Amino acid sequence: DSSESNEIDDVLFLGRRDANSFMKYPQLGN
């Protein structure tokens, strides 16, 4: 199920991006 694996990778990538944005701009977390 390569397609399913890719979807999971996308979710993890977006999660890391959001985490990085939160670290850079914590005020956006409010």
Swiss-Prot record:
Primary location recorded for the protein, binned into one broad class: secreted
The protein, known as: Matrix Gla protein
Species, as recorded: Prionace glauca
Location within or outside the cell: Secreted
GN (gene name): mgp
Annotated family: Belongs to the osteocalcin/matrix Gla protein family.
Keywords, comma-separated and alphabetical: Chondrogenesis, Developmental protein, Differentiation, Gamma-carboxyglutamic acid, Phosphoprotein, Secreted
Biological process per Gene Ontology, one example term: cell differentiation
A GO cellular component entry from the record: extracellular region
Residues the record lists as Phosphoserine modifications: S2, S3, S5
Domain of life from the UniProt record: Eukaryota
PTM comment, free text: Requires vitamin K-dependent gamma-carboxylation for its function.
Function: Associates with the organic matrix of calcified cartilage.
